[in-house]
Every structure is written in C-alpha cells, then in structure tokens.
C-alpha cells in the first residue's frame, strides 16, 4: 500500500468517526448532552490530562491545537480565556467544534 492510499484511508476513517465522539454516541439526539458526555468520559479516562495541559494557565495566551478530535480540549482552551486556534485533517472534526461553539457547551 502506498502512503497516499494509506493517508486517504486514515482521513476517511476519521471523517466517519470523529476522535472521541463515540463516548457520546448514545446521546446523539440531545447534542448538548452528547458533548457533555464526551467531555466527562474524556477526563475520566485521561484523568491526568487536565494537570498536564494546565488549561487555566493559558488565559490571554495563543494556543494552537493540532488534531481537534471532538473538540473537548479545544473547548477547555477557549473556556480558560486563551486565544485558541485549531487545525484538523478532517472537515467532520472542524464542523463538530463549530457545533460545540454554537451550542455554548
């Protein structure tokens, strides 16, 4: 398999399933609860992440997140008062982060 084909397959996979979104899958109809469940599960499973990232220390700082996934960490940067920018390989992930913003989760 050449690298172009592999990259295409990886991108297609993440377009179909945004990283982390399966945590809220059972709540698809209630989008606010969907995003809340993703966040709750993320920080229960990766319980050291908040201490590592130190979101609260980002106030007023510029942050670039590469690989937005379901947007859970990106939202933490925004909530902390940082000037946050994000990039992702997939349109699905970027759209999900925009939806979180519109839902004010």
Describe these PLM feature segments.
Residues 18-19, 39, 60, 82:
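Intrinsically disordered, low-complexity regulatory segments enriched
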Residues 23, 35, 44-46, 67-71:
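Short hydrophobic/aromatic-rich motifs at helix boundaries and adjacent loops
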Residues 58-102:
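Class I SAM-dependent methyltransferase SAM/SAH-binding core
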């Amino acid at each position: 398999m050449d690298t172009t084909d592999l990259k295409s397959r990886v991108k297609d996979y993440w377009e179909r399933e945004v990283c982390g979104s399966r945590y809220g899958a059972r709540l698809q109809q209630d989008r606010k609860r969907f995003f809340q469940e993703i966040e709750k599960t993320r920080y229960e499973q990766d319980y050291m992440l908040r201490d590592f990232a130190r979101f609260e220390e980002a106030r007023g700082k510029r942050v670039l997140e590469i690989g937005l996934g379901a947007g859970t960490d990106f939202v933490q940067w925004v909530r902390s008062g940082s000037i946050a920018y994000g990039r992702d390989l997939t349109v699905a992930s970027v759209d999900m982060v925009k939806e979180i913003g519109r839902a004010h989760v």
